[in-house]
């Protein structure tokens, strides 16, 4: 086994946001959560180094994860990546295991499989990337698959600038290596910071073996700006789409479809172009038509859309919800709502037809109220159901009716004023001959 240390103390200035960088989301999840999940998949001893807005980050983490060991970086005294793992006396923070893996919190695309080459190394090791264009990165000079030295770009000569090997920002160390060299680190550099790369340099100077482990570039993309966040999200989306299609989900124009990590699929499902699946959703034997939005809802044996919106806590089973229908906290069982309706805070029974323009009036300006509709109900177009209200089974509601009282089963309900036709009324109103 090994211990994992995740570095998350930075300010994330380039994100230009009051939200801590590591809490910015990738496909609906804070990017820190991805790296924590990966860490717990390989270790029972996970450490998180915090400083900037640490209480906010800690609160978010504790809502989801148990067993994280929190540390506060002493940035006033020991800043930088090397300082992040230092205690007050410059010794490394205590870990359960002798092998220590160090990761950055702003790399949400890292997976267990991507880390495998680094985990297999028995020596102290640094993860490397091979970049076609390494401009802006420090170069790693190799000799017989071992790290010879690390050169910052500004200090590299012309030959070294041609090197494509760069530091991925992940490390595997033995604890005795950290205990030996971490106290020797200094901050005599332009930034006045302690660097993990300098730790490696100290080891190389004393003939320590440092393995160079090449990793997949795509999995170790660092997120330091909104542009990089968007790029990481697109890569994550490609993974989620592929996983869904591998399960048999049909996607029309998949690049136009957005889905989040909490979405699960069962049975035969079709997603048309422009569909958005947000939060924890279950899509089972369902056809989600073009440009529909499903949030925190369950769609089972049903068709939804096009241009429909299932807001949180909608459970739509054996039903058809058509274009421009919005549901919220609604339970539909065997229901047809073809067009232009709002169905909020309601339960609707089997074989019920909801006409165009029907609205459940669920909010009285102070609180929400529920509408209960039985089975075999026909609701005429442009009707308003003013909650709280209970409509029995086998009920017919005439078009344009406003319902304010409960309707017993077997009833016909009408509330329209009688129609009046005034002879020559058009000409009188417009004063035309």
From Swiss-Prot:
Residues 227-247 are annotated as: Linker. Binds 1 Mg(2+) ion per subunit. One of its GO terms (biological process) is regulation of cell shape. InterPro entries: Bifunctional_GlmU, GlmU-like, GlmU_C_LbH, Hexapep, Hexapep_transf_CS, MobA-like_NTP_Trfase, Nucleotide-diphossugar_trans, Trimer_LpxA-like_sf. Residues 248-433 are annotated as: N-acetyltransferase. It is found in: Cytoplasm. Its EC number is 2.7.7.23, 2.3.1.157. Residues 1-226 are annotated as: Pyrophosphorylase. Pathway: Nucleotide-sugar biosynthesis; UDP-N-acetyl-alpha-D-glucosamine biosynthesis; N-acetyl-alpha-D-glucosamine 1-phosphate from alpha-D-glucosamine 6-phosphate (route II): step 2/2; Nucleotide-sugar biosynthesis; UDP-N-acetyl-alpha-D-glucosamine biosynthesis; UDP-N-acetyl-alpha-D-glucosamine from N-acetyl-alpha-D-glucosamine 1-phosphate: step 1/1; Bacterial outer membrane biogenesis; LPS lipid A biosynthesis. Keywords: Acyltransferase, Cell shape, Cell wall biogenesis/degradation, Cytoplasm, Magnesium, Metal-binding, Multifunctional enzyme, Nucleotidyltransferase, Peptidoglycan synthesis, Repeat, Transferase. It is an enzyme of class 2 (transferase). Acetyl-CoA binds at residues 356, 362-363, 381, 399, 416. One of its GO terms (molecular function) is glucosamine-1-phosphate N-acetyltransferase activity. UDP-N-acetyl-alpha-D-glucosamine binds at residues 7-10, 21, 80-81, 138, 152, 167, 224, 311, 328, 342, 353. One of its GO terms (cellular component) is cytoplasm. Gene3D superfamilies: Hexapeptide repeat proteins, Spore Coat Polysaccharide Biosynthesis Protein SpsA, Chain A. It catalyses: alpha-D-glucosamine 1-phosphate + acetyl-CoA = N-acetyl-alpha-D-glucosamine 1-phosphate + CoA + H(+); N-acetyl-alpha-D-glucosamine 1-phosphate + UTP + H(+) = UDP-N-acetyl-alpha-D-glucosamine + diphosphate. The active site is at 339 (proton acceptor). Homotrimer. In the N-terminal section; belongs to the N-acetylglucosamine-1-phosphate uridyltransferase family. In the C-terminal section; belongs to the transferase hexapeptide repeat family. NCBIfam families: glmU, PRK14359.1. This is Bifunctional protein GlmU.
